[in-house]
């Protein structure tokens, strides 16, 4: 997973509250067996409306989503995070996230930054009055900058550390690779062992 320290990109104002995971990615797209290629599924129902924000330039090139409260509610589906990332989003700002969505985001390298609703309102105004304005998201200082708005955001220390280090679940496990190898070396031969990684032919 790529480490996240700072990101600067076009902000996308999504004046919607209670955006659930079925709105982020409809269930029909969950039949796919891959982890990539979900950009077409992001907000699929809403994107049928030509006036939807992601159908308008320059917002269609945005990488920082600024949403209303209670973003990512509903069923737990990692596909919601995959769709946001595949479209090109690096961070989502909201005053409140569903716990499961926030957890899935941190594990997949998408920053879910909790920003006070008053600051979200100010950022929305900047983005709507000046389309194409970029937002700088700084995970080191835990701040966002948009025009003349500078606001702090909240994120738990553990998720922040994982994002800064670029550690997904596999990366965390591989930090203990030497210990795992040493343990398996002492196990009886008839017990299961970790298979070596497959090397693809060039």
Curated annotation (Swiss-Prot):
The keyword Amino-acid biosynthesis is annotated on this UniProt entry: yes
Q: Does the keyword Lyase apply?
A: yes
Q: Name one GO biological process term.
A: L-leucine biosynthetic process
Assigned EC number: 4.2.1.33
Which pathway is recorded for this entry? Amino-acid biosynthesis; L-leucine biosynthesis; L-leucine from 3-methyl-2-oxobutanoate: step 2/4
- What catalytic activity is recorded? (2R,3S)-3-isopropylmalate = (2S)-2-isopropylmalate
**Which class of enzymes does this protein belong to?**
lyase
> According to its record, what are the GO cellular component terms?
3-isopropylmalate dehydratase complex
Q: What does this protein do?
A: Catalyzes the isomerization between 2-isopropylmalate and 3-isopropylmalate, via the formation of 2-isopropylmaleate.
Subunit structure, briefly? Heterodimer of LeuC and LeuD.
The entry's family comment says: Belongs to the LeuD family. LeuD type 1 subfamily.
Q: What is the official name of this protein in its record?
A: 3-isopropylmalate dehydratase small subunit
Lineage of the organism? Bacteria, Bacillati, Actinomycetota, Actinomycetes, Micrococcales
């Amino acid at each position: 997973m790529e480490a996240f320290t700072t990101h600067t990109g076009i902000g996308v104002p999504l004046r919607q509250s209670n955006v659930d995971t079925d709105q982020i990615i409809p269930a029909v797209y969950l039949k796919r067996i891959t982890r990539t290629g979900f950009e077409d599924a992001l907000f699929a129902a809403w994107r049928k409306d030509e006036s939807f924000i992601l159908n308008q330039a320059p917002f269609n090139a945005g990488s920082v989503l600024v949403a209303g409260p209670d973003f990512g509610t509903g069923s737990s589906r990692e596909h919601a995070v995959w769709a946001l990332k595949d479209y090109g989003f690096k961070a989502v700002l909201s005053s409140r996230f569903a716990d499961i969505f926030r957890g899935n985001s941190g594990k997949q390298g998408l920053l879910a930054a909790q920003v006070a609703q008053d600051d979200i309102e100010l950022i929305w105004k900047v983005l709507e009055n000046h389309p194409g304005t970029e937002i700088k998201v700084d995970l080191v200082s835990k701040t966002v900058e948009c025009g003349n708005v500078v606001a702090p955001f909240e994120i738990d220390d553990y998720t922040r550390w994982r994002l800064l280090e670029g550690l997904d679940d596999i990366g965390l496990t591989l930090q203990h690779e030497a210990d795992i190898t040493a343990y398996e070396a002492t196990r009886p031969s008839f017990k299961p062992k970790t298979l070596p990684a497959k090397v693809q032919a060039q």
